[in-house]
């Protein structure tokens, strides 16, 4: 029998007890293996069905048990090599193969253990290294590897390494380094360490993903040292962003997983390790980088926003130091969105505000800033905001994404109040769009006057089309009709263009696009009028008057140009969509129900003479109906019941019934439910709606005006867009490769009573209008001071170049030491730069 040799003393130890091996190793063919743990899911189909419903099991889904099966009896195998397991202190175990001489000195050979998936999985799950002592010998003797299919879970493709990673004890599992050493000696280390799940639910997840998810830096280091692929993508259903299904989207890659789980140390290790550094610009299956993934996991809560913005800032700075020329924030996903545009489109207002107002103080990373403080005086400071990816001159700009996003996007109205978006839209409105909008309003008013006049003086004799008489009035009328039809054609094609470009959903059609829809319906009625007119049908008048009525209603669209009227129009819209629609649904149900009951009760001919005489005497003076009115129809009964709703009904409008008590009870119940209950409830709901949306009405109006501004700009020619573009091209510093960093910037003057000018980045000593006065700049990359409203005509680049020249030949007459300025972030957001500010103050 084989004996085991101690590495320290070389003395023999007692042999392992006989019961350490299964009975079948002793040749007992009748012995049965112990029962395996039951499956969580009997089949892959049942498992996917259960997860689709969101059910759970006591056992972790990724740690499901292996299949239950019996071991086939095999003869005992003897080998001449021995595996020695040595534990060095508290560190990981290691394994080595003894030489033949050592084996000979150990004594007689011992029968070798047989291993299958069940035995290996049990050993690694229980952290039992002794059970795996003969595993290497078994694999070498049988010429097998741990990556063979017989050692993997047939349903999920899970290996023993993945099983061990899922069964850590106090953050470690001693079988992991042993398994890696065995894989190395069987020439399958790379394949073994990068083995991943193969089922559709956890497809692509490797041991490195699990180690990062378990927040275990030691295991991450061990796996990377042994060749783990840092670009492995976990793209199973569990790792996709699917509405209504459990899962966690983190960007598929290990780097994104570490970032989205707030593990900065692992992020730095993955990017800076000497074995296989991760690619910071790598994308997942939807084209998202690590920055996109951070935006995706943001949920607008304070704690989450703080960690996401902090991690975003750290990765951005680290990427700039590792790859100075890489523009990580400008990389787009498959939808063509940058991280900034993605934050705007998904309503992540905290992340959006951070990116727009980011001001980095480190000189080597200052080119990552999107905000540059120009000067400060007390609580007042002037800032230059970078307009790249913001203005409409670029595709998928932030303004377009917010304005044209779905109505279900959270914080859609509030995002337009974040600087510089708020001031930028106001500048666009004041400079150009306002005048164009008022001109369009005037033209539309003139169009409606012409349309109304032509409709009012339409011919009434004969059938259309009418002959043109040689009279001045007919010429004016025909001219008005032609202009009215031309306006309808214009609104029709404009509506077609709008629907093709925006492709709004049914909900967005009534919430955000109601004005465009009304203009389109107005055009449809006008075109129907033309068709009926030339078809010799007098019914053209019906469609014409509908188009005329909608035309005047659409005048409310132009209230967007006036704040008070615009907010009032928003309230009307919300009350119609929220309260009136629900009221009309319930009211129509009551009206139809009681009308069918009353019309069933009424019998024509019953007491006809008395009824006709009484009703004729009662109603003829009001001109409401003739003496021979019949109420044995649903239409006439509905009209009578509608009069009860507005308080003009008569309980004795007919006597053609047999059961007077039943008739009166029906009418009284209808009056109570509609005139008393529903109408008063509608009034109360409208009052509540006004109070509720009073605060957000201004934001909604600003959103509507922003849409109008962008629609107006789209009608400009390309040369006009450049001429009317807000902001100015300025040099704000130098790029990492030494070139001029020129950006299109927009100036915003802000007042902040909580952050004073004790911390200054780029600042002029003389704020305001000080032309001709010598300026002392306080930073090596200084910008010139822009004064007042004429800041666009001020040349900033010469001052920067002059400042840079002086910095290259240092002999300053005096040193001005000013501490860096944090910016205009909110108090909660300003804490994100707390560490960098403290370091700068030191």
From Swiss-Prot:
Resiniferatoxin binds at residues 514-515, 560. The chain crosses the membrane at residues 436-457, 476-500, 514-535, 539-559, 563-601, 660-686. ANK repeats lie at residues 113-141, 156-188, 206-231, 252-279, 288-324, 338-361, 396-418. The modification Phosphothreonine is found at residues 147, 373, 708. The keyword Signal does not apply. Residues 688-716 are annotated as: AD. Keywords: ANK repeat, ATP-binding, Calcium, Calcium channel, Calcium transport, Calmodulin-binding, Cell membrane, Cell projection, Glycoprotein, Ion channel, Ion transport, Membrane, Metal-binding, Nucleotide-binding, Phosphoprotein, Postsynaptic cell membrane, Repeat, Sodium, Synapse, Transmembrane, Transmembrane helix, Transport. Na(+) 1 binds at residue 647. Glycans are attached at residue 607. Phosphorylation by PKA reverses capsaicin-induced dephosphorylation at multiple sites. Phosphorylation by CAMKII seems to regulate binding to vanilloids. Phosphorylated and modulated by PRKCE, PRKCM and probably PRKCZ. Dephosphorylation by calcineurin seems to lead to receptor desensitization and phosphorylation by CAMKII recovers activity. Changing residue 650 to A: Abolishes calcium permeability. Changing residue 650 to K: Abolishes channel activity. Residues 458-475, 536-538, 602-633, 656-659 are extracellular. Residues 781-796 are annotated as: Required for PIP2-mediated channel inhibition. Belongs to the transient receptor (TC 1.A.4) family. TrpV subfamily. TRPV1 sub-subfamily. Homotetramer. Interacts with PIRT. May also form a heteromeric channel with TRPV3. Interacts with CALM, PRKCM and CSK. Interacts with PRKCG and NTRK1, probably by forming a trimeric complex. Interacts with the Scolopendra mutilans RhTx toxin. Interacts with TMEM100. Interacts with PACS2. The association domain (AD) is necessary for self-association. This is Transient receptor potential cation channel subfamily V member 1. The gene is Trpv1.
């Amino acid at each position: 029998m084989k004996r085991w040799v101690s590495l320290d003393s070389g003395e023999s130890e007692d042999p392992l007890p006989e019961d350490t091996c299964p009975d079948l190793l002793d040749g007992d063919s009748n012995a049965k293996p112990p029962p395996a743990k039951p499956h969580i899911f009997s089949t892959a189909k049942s498992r996917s069905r259960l997860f689709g419903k969101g059910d759970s099991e006591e056992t972790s889904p990724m740690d499901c048990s292996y299949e239950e099966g019996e071991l086939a009896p095999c003869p005992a195998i003897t080998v001449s090599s021995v595996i020695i397991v040595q534990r060095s202190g508290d560190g990981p175990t290691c394994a080595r193969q003894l030489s033949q001489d050592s084996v000979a000195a150990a004594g007689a050979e011992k029968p070798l253990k047989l291993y299958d998936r069940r035995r290996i999985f049990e050993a690694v799950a229980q952290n039992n290294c002794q059970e795996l002592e003969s595993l290497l010998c078994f694999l070498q003797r049988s010429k097998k590897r741990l990556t063979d299919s017989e050692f993997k879970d047939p349903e999920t493709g899970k290996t023993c390494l993945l099983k061990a990673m899922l069964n850590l004890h106090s953050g470690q599992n001693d079988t992991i380094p042993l398994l890696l050493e065995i894989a190395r000696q069987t020439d399958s280390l790379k394949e073994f360490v990068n083995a991943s799940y193969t089922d559709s639910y956890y497809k692509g997840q490797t041991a490195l993903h699990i180690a990062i998810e378990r927040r275990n830096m030691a295991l991450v280091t061990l796996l990377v040292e042994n060749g783990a692929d840092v670009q492995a993508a976990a793209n199973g259903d569990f790792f996709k962003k699917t509405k209504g299904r459990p899962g966690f989207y983190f960007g598929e890659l290990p780097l994104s997983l570490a970032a989205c789980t707030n593990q900065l140390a692992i992020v730095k290790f993955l990017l800076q390790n000497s074995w296989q550094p991760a690619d910071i610009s790598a994308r997942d299956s939807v084209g998202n980088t690590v920055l996109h993934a951070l935006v995706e996991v943001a949920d607008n809560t304070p704690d989450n926003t703080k960690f996401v913005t902090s991690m975003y800032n750290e990765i951005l700075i680290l990427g700039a130091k590792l790859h100075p020329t890489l523009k990580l924030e400008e990389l787009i996903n498959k939808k063509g969105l940058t991280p900034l545009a993605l934050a705007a489109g998904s309503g992540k207002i905290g992340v959006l505000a951070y990116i727009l107002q980011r001001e980095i103080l480190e000189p080597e990373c200052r080119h990552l800033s999107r905000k540059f403080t120009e000067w400060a005086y007390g609580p007042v400071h002037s800032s230059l905001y970078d307009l790249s990816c913001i203005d409409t001159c670029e595709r998928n700009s932030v303004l377009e994404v917010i304005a044209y996003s779905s109505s279900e996007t959270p914080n859609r109205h509030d995002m337009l109040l974040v600087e510089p978006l708020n001031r930028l839209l106001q500048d666009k409105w004041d400079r150009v769009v306002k005048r164009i909008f008022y001109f369009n309003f005037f033209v539309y008013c003139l169009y409606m006057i012409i349309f109304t006049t032509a409709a009012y003086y339409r011919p009434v004799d004969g059938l259309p089309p009418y002959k043109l008489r040689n009279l001045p009035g007919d010429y004016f009328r025909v001219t008005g009709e032609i202009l009215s039809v031309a306006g309808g054609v214009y609104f029709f094609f404009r509506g077609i263009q709008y629907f093709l470009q925006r492709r709004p959903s049914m909900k967005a059609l009534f919430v955000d696009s109601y004005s465009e829809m009304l203009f389109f319906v107005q055009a449809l009625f006008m075109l129907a009028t033309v068709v009926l007119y030339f078809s010799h049908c007098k019914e053209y008048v019906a469609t014409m008057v509908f188009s005329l009525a909608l035309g005047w209603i659409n005048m409310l669209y132009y209230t967007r140009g006036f704040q008070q009227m615009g907010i009032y129009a928003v309230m009307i819209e919300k009350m119609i969509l929220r309260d009136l629609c629900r009221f009309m649904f319930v009211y129509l149900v009551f009206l139809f129900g009681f009308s069918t009951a009353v019309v069933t009760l009424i019998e024509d001919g019953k007491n006809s003479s008395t009824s006709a005489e009484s009703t004729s005497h009662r109603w003829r003076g009001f001109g409401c109906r003739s003496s021979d009115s019949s109420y044995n129809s649903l239409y006439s009964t509905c009209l009578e019941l509608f009069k009860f709703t507005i308080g003009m009904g008569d309980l004795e409008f007919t006597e053609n019934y047999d059961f007077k008590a039943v008739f009166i009870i029906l009418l009284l119940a209808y009056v109570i439910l509609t005139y008393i209950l529903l109408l008063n409830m509608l009034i109360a709901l409208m009052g509540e709606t006004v109070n509720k949306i009073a605060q957000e009405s201004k934001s909604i109006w600003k959103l509507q005006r922003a849409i109008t501004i962008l629609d107006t700009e789209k009608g400009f020619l390309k040369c006009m867009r450049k001429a009317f573009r807000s902001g100015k091209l300025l040099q704000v510093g130098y790029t990492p490769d030494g070139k001029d960093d020129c950006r299109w910037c927009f100036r915003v003057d802000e007042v902040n009573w909580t952050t004073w000018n004790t911390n200054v980045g780029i600042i002029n000593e003389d704020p305001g209008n000080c032309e001709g006065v010598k300026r002392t700049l306080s930073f090596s990359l200084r910008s010139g001071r822009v004064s007042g409203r004429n800041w666009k005509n001020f040349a900033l680049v010469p001052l920067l170049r002059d400042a840079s020249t002086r910095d290259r030949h240092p002999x300053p007459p005096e040193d001005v030491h000013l501490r860096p300025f944090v910016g205009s972030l909110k108090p909660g957001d300003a804490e994100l730069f707390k560490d960098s500010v403290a370091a700068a103050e030191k």
